[in-house]
């Protein structure tokens, strides 16, 4: 029995050393992978925060553009008047002449100031919205290219 124990002790020690090495190696690899996953997570969070900051800047610029549009429609209309230009729309003629008189009606009417301001305001707001949307799309595409 003593002889058996003498032969068994080196194998038990070797098994214990192997198990200890395995345990230390697996802890080391776990720590390495956890660190790598954490670094990837931090990169994604920073990229998301960066993109959100850029989108917030675009949104703030869009709000500033909308606030700046308030007086610009009046300025555009007054500039058109100074140049002796009018905003007109086509209208359906009320009637036609029976003969060949050679006269063709203009079929246009000048827009009321309120309607002109409203139309200009809508178009300018639409342009500002489209610019903000395009900036947002560019920023999101830039984020995808970084990945």
Swiss-Prot record:
| Spans through the membrane | 8-24
| GO BP terms, alphabetized | viral release from host cell by cytolysis
- InterPro entries in the record: I-spanin, I-spanin_T7likevirus
- This protein's major location comes to host cell
**Pfam families, alphabetically?**
Phage_lysis (PF03245)
What is the annotated localization of this protein? Answer: Host cell inner membrane
Q: Name one GO cellular component term.
A: membrane
Taken from the record's topology, the Periplasmic segments are 25-143
On the Cytoplasmic side, which residues?
A: 1-7
Membrane topology note: Single-pass type II membrane protein
The subunit field of the Swiss-Prot or TrEMBL record says: Interacts (via C-terminus) with the spanin outer lipoprotein subunit (o-spanin) (via C-terminus). Part of the spanin complex which spans the entire periplasmic space. The spanin complex is composed of spanin inner membrane subunit and spanin outer membrane subunit.
> What is the stated purpose of this protein?
Component of the spanin complex that disrupts the host outer membrane and participates in cell lysis during virus exit. The spanin complex conducts the final step in host lysis by disrupting the outer membrane after holin and endolysin action have permeabilized the inner membrane and degraded the host peptidoglycans. Host outer membrane disruption is possibly due to local fusion between the inner and outer membrane performed by the spanin complex.
| Protein name, entry field | Spanin, inner membrane subunit
Species name for this entry?
Enterobacteria phage T3 (Bacteriophage T3)
